[in-house]
Amino acid sequence: MHAIINGRIVLNDKVLDGCALMFDEKIKGIVSRETLDAAWENEKCWQGKPLALTDACGAYVSPGFINMHIHGCAGADTMDAKADTLEIMSRFLVQTGVTSFLPTTMTCEMQEIHKALEHIREAATVITRRRGGKPEALLDEQVTAPEAETQKYVPARGVQEDSFTMQSGLPDDKLARGKNILPGAKVLGAYLEGPFINNAYKGAQKEEQIKTADFAFIKDFADVIKVVVLAPETLEQAGKVKDFIARCKAHNIIVSLGHSAADYGTALQAIEAGASHVTHLCNAMTGLHHRQPGLLGAALDTGVTCELIADNLHIHPAVQRMIYRTKGADGLALITDSMRACGLAEGVSELGGQTVYVKNGAARLADGTIAGSVVTLNRAMANFRENTGATVPEVVRMVTENQAQELGLFEKIGSLSPGSAADITLFDENFTILYTFVDGREVYKNPEFR
């Protein structure tokens, strides 16, 4: 059993002081410091289990962050689809407070996309179970690794090498993948950004590989794809839009509108058909005009969840404030959309076979087109709070609960409620990450913290 003491525990709408967070592999609850102190003085145990303590020293204690739109970091990119690609990303992300993520593909040859999806499938904690041919999304029941002998608590520095392995002898209908086969942040599934986009708003994606949306292209990976980006105007008839969205929803795939020239009416029809998400709001879409609201207007005028890249390059701070006041914290999901150069020194990098130049915190193609970001999620949180005045609980909600709710996983991740996975992040007032725990394991400690 583990307890975090002297921390400021971040809940949905408030911050708790003077309490301790109790957990093992799952969150056990929040207790008063007096209750914990009494147990420590008497037995140094909690509910009969040896108790280990982590002193937060006044830091914030929150659910682990969820980055639901990320192409790469630390030199790795989802489309590399190499044996160590997701491991590299997993190790780096916990240093930024991220405990779960959706590796994101981009427009390429379909066989390249499928190869990347296969790698994501192998690493994913979340899969799909089928009953009678009807898919049902779920977070697999956790397979508990053999319990280690109790040892004196010694915080690790950096990401721990040990990881849980897949267990055998599981029921065929569950296809359970065990707990987390990666050393750090968990893979929840895939985010498919392209090829179903509009070439007029392709951004840094390959025009020659763009395709008209067809569920047949992705049906064999419906178990692992959690989000698919759609430019609804590229489907000529409204019936095709509705059919594509309906098939995605039947497989628990979120349809996100983006990379799109859709007008307000077309976007609204797609939202009414079930599209519930918008990819990097303001970027790669029609802008807001008082006579032509476009996709941006439809996103602001409805209840869809809107992604935001708060690196202060993709969206001006003043516009971030406007969006925050319009959508509120519950309608926003902070993301990074980062590429492989995130976490590396500035210089020349690569995205989808294209040369990218990283300078002054911006990643661009030779023609000046923005090519993703190099921001980390904790830095985006700091920027957004500074730009908007959002509270710490609100900013945390935009990287935890909102994503978990939309992915249908809020009973499992994204909160500090009893029974949730013990994915926990500790950070200071500047959003510098101090500790990260995944499924109760300490996977990162800032070497400069005490």
Spans of model-derived segments:
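Divalent metal-dependent hydrolysis catalytic cores, especially in the metallo-beta-lactamase
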Residues: H71, E87-H119, A185-N198, A222-E233, ...
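Active-site gating loops and adjacent loop-to-helix segments of metal-dependent hydrolytic enzymes
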Residues: R91-L102, N199-V224, Q269-L281, Q292-T305, ...
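C-terminal cap of metal-dependent C-N hydrolases
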Residues: G7, Q405, S415-R450
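Alpha-helical scaffold segments that flank or form the walls of functional sites
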Residues: A59-V61, M68, T78-R131, E141, ...
